[in-house]
């Protein structure tokens, strides 16, 4: 392993852009620093705990996929597979508290860690990085993460690699905007609702693509609402932000029910009706976390707790 220190790779929250990013919608992602993971070795020669063994095997399966000529020939930055294989033989695993199936980027963090550690030409990623480099890195991360989900935008591993909020625009350009509506005297609180069940990204993405192909709902409307919310957020227009966010929430409730667990639908509808809070998908949905927005999180927290849900404030 290249680095002696155990570098952390954080979970992420995709604030906006889930599904619409598939057809060039804008996206904003932020790190979720309560959860992270890092590459590690067992204290003894063999991995002793079950989770470490499972992680080691998971990375080994990923290694087999990535090292196949069909995949590795498409890399912009070649991976040192010999070094990775040696470290796997020594029991290397990814020690993580990022919940799986929660839309928090658990597989993205693994991909980011492997890319950071084992790419021969590890590009320096910072706010001054050449835009073309961001594009190449994101493309490769998407290809690497496709092992887990069948397809990937590359946003999850890129977020974990960067460890800071960023925006992806319709031309796939990366920028690092301020998010003024989430700080200051006039603001909106963002919180996560734990549905208590795991989601499965792959079948949900397939279902979504099938609906688009059948024109079961208006994909351009979904993208338009998403982009309007993003622009209102960036321009600190709370009136437009609340309005378009409410429309986006209603669109998802009416058209994307497989992504919304039945247990949370009544609270979702209550938010649509009352305006006291607004819920939307967090990542692919189907379980895991859902995203909530409110003028004051502490005023609505008890409603979710009474209904049996745990809530989390991103940090």
Q: Over which residues does each language-model region extend?
A:
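C-terminal nucleotide
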Residues: 2-16, 20-22, 29-30, 37-88, ...
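Stable alpha-helical structural segments in soluble proteins, enriched in small hydrophobic residues
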Residues: 109-121
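Gly/Ser-rich catalytic serine loop of serine hydrolases
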Residues: 97-109
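Glycine-rich beta-strand-to-loop/alpha-helix junction loops that act as flexible
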Residues: 105-107, 282-287
């Amino acid at each position: 392993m290249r680095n002696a220190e155990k570098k952390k790779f954080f979970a992420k929250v995709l604030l906006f852009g889930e599904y619409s990013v598939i057809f060039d919608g804008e996206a904003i992602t932020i790190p979720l620093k309560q959860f992270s993971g890092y590459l590690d070795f067992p204290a003894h020669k063999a991995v002793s705990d079950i989770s470490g063994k499972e992680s080691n095997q998971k990375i080994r399966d990923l290694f087999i996929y990535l090292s196949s000529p069909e995949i590795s020939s498409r890399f912009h930055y070649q991976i040192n597979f010999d070094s990775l294989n040696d470290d796997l033989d020594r029991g290397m695993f990814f020690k993580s508290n990022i919940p799986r199936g929660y839309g928090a980027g658990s597989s993205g963090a693994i991909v980011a860690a492997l890319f950071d550690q084992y790419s021969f030409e590890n590009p320096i990623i910072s706010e001054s990085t050449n835009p073309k480099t961001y594009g190449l890195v994101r493309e490769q991360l998407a290809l690497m993460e496709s092992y887990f989900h069948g397809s990937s935008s590359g946003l999850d591993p890129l977020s974990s690699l960067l460890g800071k909020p960023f925006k992806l625009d319709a031309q796939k350009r990366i920028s690092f905007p301020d998010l003024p509506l989430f700080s200051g005297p006039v603001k909106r609180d963002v919180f996560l609702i734990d549905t208590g069940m795991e989601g499965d990204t792959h079948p949900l993405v397939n279902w979504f693509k099938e609906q688009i192909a059948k024109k079961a709902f208006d994909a351009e409307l979904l993208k338009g609402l998403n982009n309007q919310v993003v622009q209102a957020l960036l321009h600190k227009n709370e009136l437009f932000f609340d309005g378009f966010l409410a429309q986006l929430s209603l669109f998802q409730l009416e058209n994307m029910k497989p992504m919304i667990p039945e247990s949370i639908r009544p609270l979702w509808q209550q938010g649509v009706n009352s305006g006291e809070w607004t819920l939307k998908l967090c990542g692919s949905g189907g379980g895991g976390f859902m995203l909530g927005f409110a003028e004051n999180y502490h005023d609505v927290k008890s409603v979710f707790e009474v209904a049996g849900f745990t809530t989390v404030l991103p940090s």
